[in-house]
Amino acid sequence: METLLLSRLPEAYVVFSPIVDVLPIIPVFFLLLAFVWQAAIGFR
């Protein structure tokens, strides 16, 4: 049962590969968003 589950995992991950490719960019996006937000408050 476990070997069958492990053999099917790569097929399941193929569907999520675009999401996994985007995931490392999300923290950078939030960092830039926080920087722009602080800059906007500082300029006001």
UniProtKB/Swiss-Prot annotation:
**Maturation-removed propeptide residues:** 1-7
**Keywords of this entry:** Chloroplast, Membrane, Photosynthesis, Photosystem II, Plastid, Reaction center, Thylakoid, Transmembrane, Transmembrane helix
Instruction: Set out the biological process GO terms recorded for this chain's protein.
Output: photosynthesis
**Membrane topology per the record?**
Single-pass membrane protein
Q: Which GO terms describe its cellular component?
A: chloroplast thylakoid membrane; photosystem II reaction center
Name where it's found.
Plastid, Chloroplast thylakoid membrane
In which broad location class does this protein mainly occur, judging by the first location in its UniProt entry?
plastid
Any transmembrane segments, and where? 23-43
**Entry-linked InterPro entries:** PSII_PsbK (IPR003687), PSII_PsbK_sf (IPR037270)
Q: How does this polypeptide assemble, per the annotation? A: PSII is composed of 1 copy each of membrane proteins PsbA, PsbB, PsbC, PsbD, PsbE, PsbF, PsbH, PsbI, PsbJ, PsbK, PsbL, PsbM, PsbT, PsbX, PsbY, PsbZ, Psb30/Ycf12, at least 3 peripheral proteins of the oxygen-evolving complex and a large number of cofactors. It forms dimeric complexes.
- What family is reported? Belongs to the PsbK family.
Kindly give the HAMAP family that the UniProt entry links to this protein: PSII_PsbK
Q: Which NCBIfam families does the record cross-reference, listed alphabetically? A: PRK02553.1
Q: What is the annotated role of this protein in its UniProt record?
A: One of the components of the core complex of photosystem II (PSII). PSII is a light-driven water:plastoquinone oxidoreductase that uses light energy to abstract electrons from H(2)O, generating O(2) and a proton gradient subsequently used for ATP formation. It consists of a core antenna complex that captures photons, and an electron transfer chain that converts photonic excitation into a charge separation.
Identification of the protein by name: Photosystem II reaction center protein K
Q: Per the UniProt entry, what species is this protein from, by scientific name?
A: Phaeodactylum tricornutum (strain CCAP 1055/1)
Q: Which gene encodes it?
A: psbK
